[in-house]
């Protein structure tokens, strides 16, 4: 656990992080610009918020269940191979592209990014979504029957929110952007 061990710099370069049995890595608030976890295939928890990461390759980390990468400088993040992912936080980055694909994912916080779109169609267990302050014109939550928390305001660009008929409870608990129209599928 290197959480808040200020000044670690780039200690996590490939030659330094050879931990094939490591399942939890916390390295928040360390000003890291690179983090190579490719030699850690057993990681289930990765918390690396409040760093300076511009990229993060998770190709070899298919067991991750809890991923926290907020407050970095990430522009793209492919988490589509993380089929065991349950909670995911990537807020306050510079993301323009985000790929998710986990039947177990229940919690997504991706607010304050530059996302143009977000595909939620393969996230049937999604319970909470915070996606405000992005650049979507449309968002489709009609394939997310478990969704109970949906936060998309403010987002001036949002014009259409697609929902299913059974999601009326969301309208009671969420504040939609003024210009957005709700369309039932």
Model-derived features: positions:
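Conserved hydrophobic beta-strand positions in leucine-rich repeat
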Residues: 6, 23-27, 44-48, 65-69, ...
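Leucine-rich solenoid repeat scaffolds
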Residues: 141-185
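C-terminal capping segment of individual leucine-rich repeats
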Residues: 4, 18-19, 28, 39, ...
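Canonical leucine-rich repeat
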Residues: 13-14, 35, 56, 77, ...
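Consensus "Asn ladder" position of solenoid repeat domains
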Residues: 30, 51, 72, 93, ...
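Serine/threonine-rich, low-complexity intrinsically disordered segments
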Residues: 3-4, 35, 71
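Single conserved hydrophobic/aromatic residue that forms the stacking wall/gate
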Residues: 1-12
